[in-house]
């Protein structure tokens, strides 16, 4: 009989952490984090990383596994999941994937494009061009070479602009076409995925604001100050571009006021939640949607997982 893998997705501040731990207890599971920010050590408050007390007796994976200066790709995530699932099953446990990084879920569901690896020389060339002419110029160049990719990539998204241009320069082909035609990896097993969705978006927005202010009370700015002591980290580092951290960095640089920092941090988190919900809505035919406000949501999820 083919093994099943269970999943719980949802936007930030939707209550995934406490719900997932309760569910993991019920189905005898270990949790694999599906969150691109939780992999980093020393980034605890701003990522709402579950504490050891919150984790309780449930073993969690892919939390605190790399330094903020290191990178962790979708391919790295898939490789880790495929290794961890076997270890978890060998212990007689179920696998429960929990998080809000939808690109990770997408990689598991659809597989990953087998595109060429990054080349340092090309990256350095692109970085020199960015410094000389600006990121908007590079986005315009991408638009000339691959309009479809340029339309999908935000003009301020340096990481994705660089990657698209890099692949075009290496292969001589359009990035958008290669992404569609070269898929590898993904899960062999069936993924039974539930996603939390708010019936009332204003409640989620209020929760986001409340949690952001709680993070400040818990010492979020002290956490960022500690990260700033590492000379290898800047506000352009992938880890520091996580929601909240970049805005805190700008405030501590003196670029914005404290009030602007708080406002921008909350707005950025709400925008993240909106993007997460867009992913979920696009997948609603393949996953089970569960309203955040539903008082019986845990039971609904357990029934979908065939645990009564």
Swiss-Prot record:
Keywords: ATP-binding, Magnesium, Nucleotide-binding, Transferase, tRNA processing. ATP binds at residues 10-17. Residues 35-38, 159-163 are annotated as: Interaction with substrate tRNA. GO terms for biological process: tRNA modification. One of its GO terms (molecular function) is tRNA dimethylallyltransferase activity. Its cofactor is Mg(2+). Pfam families: IPPT. The keyword ATP-binding applies. Its EC number is 2.5.1.75. The record marks 101, 123 as: Interaction with substrate tRNA. Signal peptide: none annotated. Substrate binds at residues 12-17. It catalyses: adenosine(37) in tRNA + dimethylallyl diphosphate = N(6)-dimethylallyladenosine(37) in tRNA + diphosphate. HAMAP family: IPP_trans (MF_00185). Belongs to the IPP transferase family. NCBIfam families: miaA. Monomer. Catalyzes the transfer of a dimethylallyl group onto the adenine at position 37 in tRNAs that read codons beginning with uridine, leading to the formation of N6-(dimethylallyl)adenosine (i(6)A). PANTHER family: TRNA DIMETHYLALLYLTRANSFERASE. This is tRNA dimethylallyltransferase. It comes from Francisella philomiragia subsp. philomiragia (strain ATCC 25017 / CCUG 19701 / FSC 153 / O#319-036).
